[in-house]
């Protein structure tokens, strides 16, 4: 059985500023399998977030191939990309990106409702997921009524509620104090193990990187395993 869920092959990404071309990624190859724990590290501005956006179908490469399951990102239209993202990927960012006018429960229900799930079923799954992250008593609270760590836990619940094959996380603990960051990261690893969801984290935090199964370095456009 093939457990590879997300791949990039010979991935290039360039930006033009009007007078010159900046090559950010130069032939990046990556294979992500079920349950993987991967940290991507590298200097600021090296293209780590760009790589994550490309893997998630949020941006298009200059050239190369990105495959999610058996689907080539470049061969489908934007509507199909949105549907595939919502079915198979979860995203967690440094800023939680919760919708401020909605409660924690409503924020976590959102991806399920967008996928066409009935409200009652979506509510049941969202409550269960918020219970998993220790927030069942905070279901009716809006983001402004939650602490930074609680908001990030809601964001994690939202990313995992539809049981994605892979979660792409960009500095998910970057805005949190050390103690809260450690608790949030522990939670991500626990859910990764329990749900067998691949976890790919872009981070500057060496303590986080050390706890992942694979540490990849992005430097001068190339991605390689840290020795």
Curated annotation (Swiss-Prot):
SUPFAM superfamilies: P-loop containing nucleoside triphosphate hydrolases. Residues 6-227 form the ABC transporter domain. It is a peripheral membrane protein. Its main location: membrane. Gene3D superfamilies: P-loop containing nucleotide triphosphate hydrolases (3.40.50.300). PROSITE patterns: ABC_TRANSPORTER_1 (PS00211), ABC_TRANSPORTER_2 (PS50893), LOLD (PS51244). One of its GO terms (biological process) is lipoprotein localization to outer membrane. One of its GO terms (molecular function) is transmembrane transporter activity. ATP binds at residues 42-49. It holds the Pfam family ABC_tran. It is an enzyme of class 7 (translocase). GO terms for cellular component: plasma membrane. SMART domains: AAA. It is found in: Cell inner membrane. Keywords: ATP-binding, Cell inner membrane, Cell membrane, Membrane, Nucleotide-binding, Translocase, Transport. Its EC number is 7.6.2.-. The complex is composed of two ATP-binding proteins (LolD) and two transmembrane proteins (LolC and LolE). Part of the ABC transporter complex LolCDE involved in the translocation of mature outer membrane-directed lipoproteins, from the inner membrane to the periplasmic chaperone, LolA. Responsible for the formation of the LolA-lipoprotein complex in an ATP-dependent manner. Belongs to the ABC transporter superfamily. Lipoprotein translocase (TC 3.A.1.125) family. This is Lipoprotein-releasing system ATP-binding protein LolD. It comes from Legionella pneumophila subsp. pneumophila (strain Philadelphia 1 / ATCC 33152 / DSM 7513).
